[in-house]
Regions:
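ABC-type nucleotide-binding domain
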Residues: 1-253
Length: 253
């Protein structure tokens, strides 16, 4: 469960506008990590936003577990997907309420599940340090937490629901490199069955992905592992060498 397949997907915001995403095809098997990289405006975020149907494809189709996303009820589809946006959204209330958001009222999350999600998202320490713990207050927009903390709480919220598919829409950019690395190692070990789709700007975030798609102006201009792309894809090489040294780049898959 958690297989995602794009079949010749094209998306434009309106009938006559230019395609933001054009003729994209790939398949993610359950449990795989697929990453998307490319310059700003290359269509990475739009591409993953088509899975939970924030937008609908203009042509082609997207299948989740072999079923077209348009044939699911929206709630059923979104229950399969944990989506973490680039800008974490927190609501006024307490930590508990923020983690439980999106869970059905009949089966609220247990505190144990919340702590597990917080630990996995590298948030346990700063919540434990607060006197009220899970009952700690969250200001509107989460302004009483740092940017990196807000991001980790949004990741914990998505993890707590145990979705089949996790979509990180550039969600690692607010984290420092060390937290980013530790979090990805933990995710790799403890969410093996979840399919992970990662939109990123930093090569270091995606070097271990099973498949990386390089996007340029809405088109896939390369796909493969880090090693393959580093050897034969100019767009990827350009991004990679502008960020990391040759030695650092040799550690990926």
């Amino acid at each position: 469960k958690g297989q995602v397949e794009y079949r010749d997907v094209t998306f434009r915001y309106s009938k006559n506008s230019e395609a933001v995403v054009e003729h994209v095809s790939f398949k993610a098997e359950a449990g795989q990590t697929i990453a998307f990289i490319g310059s700003t405006g290359s269509g990475k975020s739009t591409l993953v936003n088509l899975i939970p149907r924030f937008y609908d494809v203009s042509a082609g189709e997207i299948l989740v577990d072999g079923v077209n996303v348009q044939d699911y009820g929206l709630e059923d589809l979104r229950n399969k997907v944990g989506y973490i946006p680039q800008k974490a959204v927190l609501f006024s209330g307490d930590v508990k309420g923020n983690l439980d958001f999106g869970h059905s009222q009949e089966t609220p999350l247990s505190e144990q599940a919340m702590w597990q999600a917080l630990e996995l998202a590298q948030s346990k320490n700063f919540i434990e340090d607060k006197e009220a713990g899970l009952e700690s207050e969250v200001a509107q927009g989460g302004t009483n937490f740092s940017g990196g903390q807000r991001q980790r709480l949004a990741i914990a919220r998505a993890l707590a629901r145990k979705p089949e598919i996790l979509i990180f829409d550039d969600s690692f950019s607010a984290l420092d490199y060390k937290t980013d690395r530790v979090l990805r190692q933990e995710l790799a070990e403890k969410t093996k069955s979840m399919t992970k789709l990662i939109v990123a700007q930093r090569i270091s975030t995606i070097m271990d992905a099973d498949l990386i798609l390089v996007l340029d102006q809405g088109k896939v201009v390369g796909q493969g592992t880090h090693k393959e792309l580093l050897a034969n894809n100019e767009v990827y090489q350009e991004i990679a060498y502008s960020q990391l040294s040759k030695e650092e780049l040799e550690h990926g898959k």
